[in-house]
Structures are given as structure tokens and as C-alpha cells.
């Protein structure tokens, strides 16, 4: 005789029907890190964008000042007198600074776009490989920019001294050529490049902090 607990009134299965097996619960998979909500605060991303924007502005200004820097002087050869014009390309250090400022400006613009997208959709720059890539590039850009600015600072010193900056066989400088404006604008572009480096270095520090805070 069946007990009450074994009767059909206490069973959830209809008499004659086999008990259905309950499927095992499948554990929910953890999404890959790229889709995890970033732990970096929104303020950190905004600060990085602002710093990159400042770097971009100062790099473009330094590039523009350097590109527009020219000087004219007269050269007498016998009875003939000719007017010569020099540009920033007269010294390789200035050409180097011009190229570096252009690269830093383009790089900063690209990273601003990337981080603005990241600010909207979140999660892209928090991927470990991307964060490492950005960190390495920030460090590289800061190093290259400070090396170019330092070399150009020495170029300004050479231009102001009694040194050959025009390619002629005799020593001529900004002072005795009457092109002091040339050296002044060159000094201004170098100073602006140093300011751009300052913001680039701070940006590199921010990217390093974001990298080390990733899980």
C-alpha cells in the first residue's frame, strides 16, 4: 500500500508520466575584458582629452611659428649685391623640430578622437593591449618632442653666436646680419614646443596611471 507521500496527490507528476529531468543550470560566462565596464573614471578620460588638446594646440602653434620664420640679408660679391633669404630649414635642428611637432599634432588629434569615442561607448581603451600601446606611444612622443626642442634650443644659441648659419664660408649670425627677428621667432617656437612637451609628459603620466589601474 502506497503511503501518502507516494500518492498521486502529493506528486507533481501525472500518474503514469515519467518524471522530467530538470536541466542543469549553466553558469553565466564572464564577458571578455573589452566589454567590461571600465573602472577608470569618466573624469580621467576627460582629463586625458583636455591634455591632448592642449598638446595639439601648442604643437600646431610651434609648427606655424617655425614655418613662417624667415630672414633676409644682403650679400656683396665684388660690385654686385644680392639679397638672400633664410628659412627654418637652414638648420637641421629646426627641420627636426618642425617634423616632430607635425607628428605630435597628428597623433594627439587621433587620440582625441579615439578617447571621445571611448567616452561615448566606453570600454575600448580599457583593453590591456590598447592601453599598453597608447602608453608606449605617449612615452615615445614625449621623448622625441623633448629631444627635438632641446636640439632646436641649441640651434637658437648657434644662430645668435658668431657662427655660420647660412652656408657661406665666413662666420655670420643673426646679430651681424640684422635678422634678429629670425632668432626671436625661432626662440618663440622652441619655447612653445617645450610647453607642448610639458602637456605631453603629463598625458603620458595619465596613460600610465590608467594602465596600472586595469584589472
Curated annotation (Swiss-Prot):
Swiss-Prot/TrEMBL keywords: Cell membrane, Glycoprotein, Membrane, Transmembrane, Transmembrane helix
GO cellular component, one term: plasma membrane
Membrane-side (Extracellular) residue stretches: 66-93, 150-185
Topological relation to the membrane, as annotated: Multi-pass membrane protein
Residues of this chain annotated as glycosylated in UniProt: 164
InterPro entries: CASP/CASPL, CASP_dom
Cytoplasmic side of membrane: 1-44, 115-128, 207-215
Domain of life of the organism encoding this protein: Eukaryota
Location in the cell: Cell membrane
Protein family (similarity comment): Belongs to the Casparian strip membrane proteins (CASP) family.
Subunit (UniProt): Homodimer and heterodimers.
Protein name: CASP-like protein UU3
Amino acid at each position: 500500500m502506497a503511503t501518502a507521500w507516494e500518492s498521486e496527490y502529493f506528486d507533481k507528476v501525472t500518474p503514469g508520466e515519467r518524471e522530467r529531468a530538470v536541466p542543469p543550470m549553466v553558469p553565466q560566462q564572464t564577458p571578455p575584458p573589452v566589454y567590461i565596464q571600465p573602472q577608470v573614471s569618466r573624469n580621467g578620460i576627460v582629463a586625458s582629452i583636455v591634455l591632448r588638446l592642449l598638446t595639439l594646440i601648442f604643437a600646431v602653434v610651434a609648427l606655424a611659428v617655425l614655418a613662417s620664420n624667415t630672414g633676409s640679408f644682403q650679400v656683396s660679391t665684388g660690385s654686385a649685391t644680392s639679397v638672400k633669404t633664410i628659412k627654418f630649414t637652414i638648420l637641421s635642428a629646426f627641420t627636426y623640430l618642425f617634423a616632430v611637432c607635425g607628428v605630435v599634432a597628428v597623433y594627439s588629434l587621433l587620440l582625441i578622437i579615439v578617447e571621445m569615442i571611448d567616452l561615448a561607448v566606453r570600454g575600448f581603451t580599457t583593453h590591456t593591449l590598447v592601453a599598453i600601446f597608447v602608453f608606449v606611444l605617449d612615452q615615445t612622443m614625449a621623448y622625441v618632442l623633448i629631444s627635438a626642442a632641446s636640439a632646436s634650443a641649441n640651434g637658437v644659441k648657434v644662430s645668435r653666436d658668431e657662427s655660420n648659419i647660412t652656408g657661406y664660408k665666413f662666420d655670420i649670425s643673426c646679430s651681424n646680419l640684422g635678422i634678429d627677428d629670425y632668432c626671436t621667432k625661432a626662440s618663440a617656437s622652441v619655447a612653445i614646443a617645450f610647453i607642448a612637451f610639458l602637456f605631453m609628459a603629463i598625458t603620458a603620466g595619465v596613460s600610465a596611471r590608467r594602465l596600472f589601474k586595469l584589472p
